[in-house]
Curated annotation (Swiss-Prot):
Protein's job: With S4 and S5 plays an important role in translational accuracy. Interacts with and stabilizes bases of the 16S rRNA that are involved in tRNA selection in the A site and with the mRNA backbone. Located at the interface of the 30S and 50S subunits, it traverses the body of the 30S subunit contacting proteins on the other side and probably holding the rRNA structure together. The combined cluster of proteins S8, S12 and S17 appears to hold together the shoulder and platform of the 30S subunit.
Protein name as catalogued: Small ribosomal subunit protein uS12
Organism, as annotated: Geobacillus stearothermophilus
One function term, GO molecular function aspect: tRNA binding
GO CC annotation terms, alphabetical: small ribosomal subunit
Amino acid sequence: MPTINQLVRKGREKKVFKSKSPALNKGYNSFKKEQTNVASPQKRGVCTRVGTMTPKKPNSALRKYARVRLTNGIEVTAYIPGIGHNLQEHSVVLIRGGRVKDLRGVRYHIIRGGLDTAGVANRMQGRSKYGAKKPKAAKK
């Protein structure tokens, strides 16, 4: 327990907050060609590589991912959720934060149904998370 005198001489240190999705906290000023500290909830980017990755130890699968170059110049690895996708090398995608626990280095998700990314086909439950449209009611 510090004395009052010790606190006067050297105050309490603020805790440093470390972002879980740092690429979303940087903007880019194309006129000045410099990065800015403007955070955004989503960012647009172009796929540079699309592939599959194996998860960490207890799990086994081929998880789909894309390497994305964002509009602020940062390149990140993003997870492609849902069954099946239409992404290729120059597809324009929208990413959001949110890591995938069993994939190393994947801190972002691609938003299905945004820009070049199609929604998941034949999806009936949790449609909003996968960009699936409401099916038309069958005629009697």
